[in-house]
Amino acid sequence: MKTLEEVAKALKNTYMEHEVDEKLPLIQEIQRLKKEKNAILLGHNYMTPDVFHGVSDITGDSLYLSKVAADTDADVILFNGVHFMAETAKLMSPQKKVLIADLKAGCSLAESITRQDVIDLKQKYPGVPVVTYVNCTADVKAETDICCTSANALQVVESLESDTVIFLPDRYLAANVQNLTQKKIITHPGSCMVHEMYSAEDIELTRRQFPGVTVISHPECKTEVVDRSDYSGSTSQMSDFIRKSEAKNIFLITECSMGDNLRSEFPDRHFVSTCQVCPHMKKITLEKIRDSLLYDQYEIHLDPEVIEKGRMSVQRMLDLSFKK
């Protein structure tokens, strides 16, 4: 757990000094409640800096946080992210109390597909394996052979023996995987409301304005964006790329808070962006996190059959990605 001094130092890269001073008492209260409840707070990379740096014990992308959820010894998991992420934590630790600070923190991708959609596709393409991006509900995962994240999508697809794969629900991630594999990809018209907003023109304008800028995009973006980027990867892969790179000017094509959080880790870099905000991620606030711990709200409950089947699809992914 970071000290309040360490938190304050990290937050001063994003907030005014008086804003930091206002946040610290609430952060201190959350830290106290965490210890009382033996709770672990998992924070996705798209959390605002006060949540990301201030109260999250473990931060990262969906793949890493899924593994942490499966391995934790904490009694309570509070997921600072959106609803499908908390559901995934419940799948992987069904015996734990899993909380999310706001039940309305949804996801445009998760809302784009239903369990029945998957059943219908399986009937239309019998015997074809189904790969589902983790950005979906638990009952969709329950109809899936194996899950994937943006960090391991190609690895998962290539691991399957079939020449044809059903890949759901992100059409842009599917298209970017299709460009890297010989397998035939059958997909679904889902998309991320944040990443689909970026265009090739955004990159061209930024390159003209900042000659020599390094462009890093998320694979949920359109192919025209990914193809024009210097690198494309998951949020954790973006961080790793920057850590190993000497690039000074970086155009980060993803959700706003990712850049805000990286500024604290890389104060010597200049992040330029046409920022896109995820309204769902921004529903998670310090006040709601405090109330979640204080009142044990809002707990994730899943049908036992969904847990059994959905857990298998996530576990297959983890076994593949973290095999020893």
UniProtKB/Swiss-Prot annotation:
Compartment(s): Cytoplasm
Q: Which UniProt keywords apply?
A: 4Fe-4S, Cytoplasm, Iron, Iron-sulfur, Metal-binding, Pyridine nucleotide biosynthesis, Transferase
EC id:
2.5.1.72
- Pfam families assigned to the protein according to its UniProt record, in alphabetical order: NadA
Q: What is its main location?
A: cytoplasm
The family database entries (InterPro entries) matched by this protein are listed as: NadA, NadA_sf, Quinolinate_synth_type2
Q: Which GO terms describe its cellular component?
A: cytosol
UniProt keyword Iron-sulfur, yes or no:
yes
Instruction: Return the broad EC class.
Output: transferase
Pathway involvement of the protein, from the record: Cofactor biosynthesis; NAD(+) biosynthesis; quinolinate from iminoaspartate: step 1/1
Example GO molecular function term? 4 iron, 4 sulfur cluster binding
- What does the cofactor field's note say? Binds 1 [4Fe-4S] cluster per subunit.
Q: Which reaction does it catalyse?
A: iminosuccinate + dihydroxyacetone phosphate = quinolinate + phosphate + 2 H2O + H(+)
| Domain of life the protein comes from | Bacteria
User: What Gene3D superfamilies does its record include?
Assistant: NadA-like
User: GO:BP terms for this protein?
Assistant: 'de novo' NAD biosynthetic process from L-aspartate
The Swiss-Prot or TrEMBL record lists the needed cofactor(s) as: [4Fe-4S] cluster
Give the residues the record marks as binding iminosuccinate.
Answer: H44, S62, Y133, V134, N135, S150, H218, P219, E220, T235
In which residues is [4Fe-4S] cluster bound?
C107, C192, C278
Q: Does the keyword Metal-binding apply?
A: yes
The family this protein is said to belong to: Belongs to the quinolinate synthase family. Type 2 subfamily.
PANTHER family registered for this protein in UniProt = QUINOLINATE SYNTHASE, CHLOROPLASTIC, QUINOLINATE SYNTHETASE A
Q: What does this protein do?
A: Catalyzes the condensation of iminoaspartate with dihydroxyacetone phosphate to form quinolinate.
Query: What is the protein's name according to its record?
Result: Quinolinate synthase
Q: Which organism is it from?
A: Leptospira interrogans serogroup Icterohaemorrhagiae serovar Lai (strain 56601)
- Originating gene: nadA
